[in-house]
Amino acid sequence: NNEARTESPEDAIALDRAVQASWLGHPHLVVIGNPPTGGFDAKLTRILAAVLNILGEPEPVEIERKWLLPEPPPADLLATSAPVDIFQVYLRPEQGPDGLVERRVRSRTHDGHTVYFHTTKRPAPGGGRVEHEERIGAETFRLLAAMRDPDTVPVRKRRHCFVHEGQHFEL
């Protein structure tokens, strides 16, 4: 029902999958499907919220869901995923008005390209944390990483990014 699109539904699905595959591994990949209710306006609202979050507007409360896998993922899943190497350094915490502010720097390398981030997590009223992440340069990363919290060790991890049923996952 979109007059601007001329491809068949099958071609549109193939194009959507190709676009998703090209973005796999990006640190801020968000897949925004069609909502069950609310129509196009609801989709635009979700897009705007995602863009504001990426631009640094803090989310009310950080919510992450993690699961422990009982066995390694199937090889075919890893073969179609985008591997991302992460190096993360926790910095000395700072005292904020509502408690300690957790800080870290992180590098993400995908296909030979590295991007750097500085993240703060502040206590939120009623529990939870408000996270703010900003992109930084390599030199800033190096300088901040030198302020590592001596009670922590740097973390190296490999994530495998993929889209399943319209949702982005990092394994």
Label for each model-derived stretch:
Residues 49-171:
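Phosphate-end processing signature that detects enzymes handling 5′-triphosphorylated RNA
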Residues 4, 24-28, 125, 143:
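Generic alpha-helix detector with strongest preference for long hydrophobic helices that associate
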Residues 1-24, 34, 38:
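A glycine- and Lys/Arg-enriched "phosphate-lid" helix/loop adjacent to the NTP-binding pocket
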Residues 26-46:
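Phosphate-binding beta-loop-alpha motif at adenosine-nucleotide cofactor sites
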Residues 16-28, 95-101:
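Short C-terminal domain-edge/linker segments immediately following a structured domain
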